[in-house]
């Protein structure tokens, strides 16, 4: 058997020769190292740094009912404004109601084994989802809107 080579302990480098990366990793006992800024997957430092050569990311369009809420508000009360928080609440309210109506209309179409949601399913779902007098007004306004749309 060949004799094993003796392992000599690695000589300690002087402090000034120690790379900056190693210094950053060493932290005092008991403290967590600071989190480094990480880029999302698929993004390079050149794009993040404001390099003009990279492609601009297209803005995702977000559809809201804010302009329509504002138009209705001005029809009903021309002298009253609305705060952005109240507008956001109204937008969420309309999204919730439409989601309930669409879900109910989908159920009705499924029950009747129809592949299509028609104005009849929407009208029935309005009667089921909205209470009493509100449902009557909604049905009459909806019928009026559909008639106006089909006549033009």
From Swiss-Prot:
The modification N6-acetyllysine is found at residues 7, 37. It comes from Triticum aestivum (Wheat). Keywords: Acetylation, Chromosome, DNA-binding, Isopeptide bond, Nucleosome core, Nucleus, Ubl conjugation. Gene3D superfamilies: Histone, subunit A. The keyword Nucleus applies. Core component of nucleosome. Nucleosomes wrap and compact DNA into chromatin, limiting DNA accessibility to the cellular machineries which require DNA as a template. Histones thereby play a central role in transcription regulation, DNA repair, DNA replication and chromosomal stability. DNA accessibility is regulated via a complex set of post-translational modifications of histones, also called histone code, and nucleosome remodeling. It is found in: Nucleus; Chromosome. Belongs to the histone H2B family. There is a cross-link at residue 148 (Glycyl lysine isopeptide (Lys-Gly) (interchain with G-Cter in ubiquitin)). Residues 1-28 have a biased composition (Basic and acidic residues). One of its GO terms (cellular component) is nucleosome. Residues 1-60 are annotated as: Disordered. Phosphorylation of H2B was not detected. The lineage of its organism: Eukaryota, Viridiplantae, Streptophyta, Embryophyta, Tracheophyta. This is Histone H2B.1. InterPro entries: Histone-fold, Histone_H2A/H2B/H3, Histone_H2B, HISTONE_H2B_site. One of its GO terms (molecular function) is DNA binding. CDD domains: HFD_H2B. SMART domains: H2B.
